[in-house]
């Protein structure tokens, strides 16, 4: 399990989901905080953001501009359902997409990077479709923007990521299920 990429995106839903001290200092790591259920204390988030800055990690907040400004995050993550067009051009934006239409929407929104979802098959009951390596590589040839694979990435198929023509990778459920994977990857 040795993957060489320029950028690694890790999704967390709580600041306790990941132990930053287990991961080497690196400017390659982007942490995306997307808490849908409970509101976390802003002071706690600010301290977490400072710890990220000390370790050289970029800290992005999902879909919440006020929270981004309150904890002084590095940028904003726009989910695929977020259709707002008018955003501040000075904010670093990362978008999420599942199809061509959503990729084009994220480009119009000004996203510098797009996380394209479901590279591999997932266990979700209502989400059966996925791109696969060949289709994903064909899709990213059509765009000049940085497109990163997300979805279905597990410890068992990490080596296949070396075949993806992308500058990075994104992990969501694998960091929750197996937190030690983050320290092994980097």
Across the structure, where does each feature detected by a protein language model lie?
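Short, acidic/polar
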Residues: 11-24, 63-66, 99-105, 154-159
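Glycine-rich phosphate-binding active-site loops on the catalytic face of alpha/beta enzymes
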Residues: 76-87, 115-130, 152-186
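Histidine/lysine/aspartate-rich catalytic loop segments that bind and position anionic ligands
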Residues: 93-122
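Structural motif
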Residues: 25-26, 71, 109, 142, ...
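Conserved, mostly hydrophobic/aromatic
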Residues: 31, 68, 106, 114, ...
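N-terminal active-site wall of soluble small-molecule enzyme domains
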Residues: 27-89
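Alpha-helix-loop-beta-strand connector modules within alpha/beta enzyme cores
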Residues: 44-60, 83, 88-100, 128-152, ...
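Hydrophobic faces of well-ordered beta-strands that scaffold small-molecule active sites
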Residues: 6-12, 29-33, 59-61, 76-78, ...
């Amino acid at each position: 399990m040795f993957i060489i990429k320029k950028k690694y995106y890790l999704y967390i839903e709580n600041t306790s989901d990941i132990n930053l001290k287990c991961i080497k200092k690196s400017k390659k790591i982007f942490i995306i905080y997307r808490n849908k259920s409970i509101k976390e204390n802003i002071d706690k988030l600010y301290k977490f953001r400072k710890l990220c800055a000390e370790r050289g990690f970029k800290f992005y907040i999902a879909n919440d501009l006020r929270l981004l400004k309150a904890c002084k995050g590095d940028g904003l993550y726009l989910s695929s359902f977020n259709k707002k067009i008018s955003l501040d051009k000075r904010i670093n934006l990362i978008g999420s997409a599942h199809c061509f239409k959503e990729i084009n929407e994220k480009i119009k929104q000004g996203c510098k990077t797009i996380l394209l979802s479901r590279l591999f098959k997932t266990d979700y009951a209502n989400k059966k479709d996925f791109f696969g390596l060949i289709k994903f590589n064909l899709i990213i040839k059509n765009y000049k923007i940085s497109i990163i694979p997300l979805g279905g990435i597990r410890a068992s198929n990490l080596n296949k990521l070396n075949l993806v023509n992308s500058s990075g990778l994104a992990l969501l459920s694998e960091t929750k299920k197996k937190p030690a994977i983050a320290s092994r990857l980097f």
